[in-house]
């Protein structure tokens, strides 16, 4: 199992090219199941979760390959299996997105109950209830979600009980091939939903309202091929902005979209950063200063993203002052805090709230990554701490950050990957 060794007290500065968004690429890859013709996707990041998804698609009978330019080519015209097995699904919660397009196009699907990050309860209930309202018969048997429908799904009005990105995407995908009109109320509004809707519309779907809490889909009989470029990763962008903010540095994030990060940019400016934006870049300059503490409350988009909470927790641990962080989206999402405390941070956790007391300096030690975003906060902490930090279980990071050590090195970080066998 790989680890990172990080030598600290680096000021992180320079330019970084932002990858395509994992959280858009994954649903779009699964949505390609709906197409009867080949699909070409560009700006798809090279990540563990992407490779897992491609393997699931191949298991179903999709021809899925990358060409010499890195584009992903998909042909789902000859799908002949309708089961996503446990051995592939177990590592990734997003694999539940195979269910809706299979049921919508082939009227049957079996998807193993998924795995992934250990961030509290992320039930698939909302996916299931949405598909049931469209007419699917669903049972849970032997660890599998089994769905079928005798004919096409039928459009209806669906009010999602709790705002859910995953369920919004599942219902929207299924509705593209349903008879009649489907209206999703209380839909999630994330940019990745907009990107998925744009992709589906290029294939011939009739979706309006994506990006609002009211999405309308007119069902069509079939979807065709298209080309699509994945939207830039707003969470990777925010992570590199934090890297400069906590180290007194200056970073230019290229190939990104500032309008997907308004809540994050507002908080960075509140923390004392100078932030300038163009159509496809964001520049953050801390001018060598220590950040000021900022209160954070996570919320569905356009609120503050839960996937940036761990990075801002780190910022607050080295900032001037005391801050309160409230996590409203997921339970059990403060697992990075005990590790940061081991590095000299000061914080108390009570329920879904953490109170951080900024310290001037963290100290390197050995820490364990527990989930994707917690992991990257520990790596960034190592970049600014004194001495050496070892980050274990970095497979979490490989699930969501493309070429992370190369990008950090380009900004001046002293970081290397090694395995336990190297230590022997």
Swiss-Prot record:
Disulfide bonds: none annotated. Its main location: cytoplasm. It catalyses: phosphoenolpyruvate + UDP-N-acetyl-alpha-D-glucosamine = UDP-N-acetyl-3-O-(1-carboxyvinyl)-alpha-D-glucosamine + phosphate. InterPro entries: Enolpyruvate_Tfrase_dom, Enolpyruvate_Tfrase_sf, MurA_subfamily, RNA3'P_cycl/enolpyr_Trfase_a/b, UDP_GlcNAc_COvinyl_MurA. It is found in: Cytoplasm. GO terms for cellular component: cytoplasm. UDP-N-acetyl-alpha-D-glucosamine binds at residues 93, 122-126, 162-165, 307, 329. GO terms for molecular function: UDP-N-acetylglucosamine 1-carboxyvinyltransferase activity. The active site is at 117 (proton donor). This is UDP-N-acetylglucosamine 1-carboxyvinyltransferase. It comes from Haemophilus influenzae (strain 86-028NP). The lineage of its organism: Bacteria, Pseudomonadati, Pseudomonadota, Gammaproteobacteria, Pasteurellales. The gene is murA.
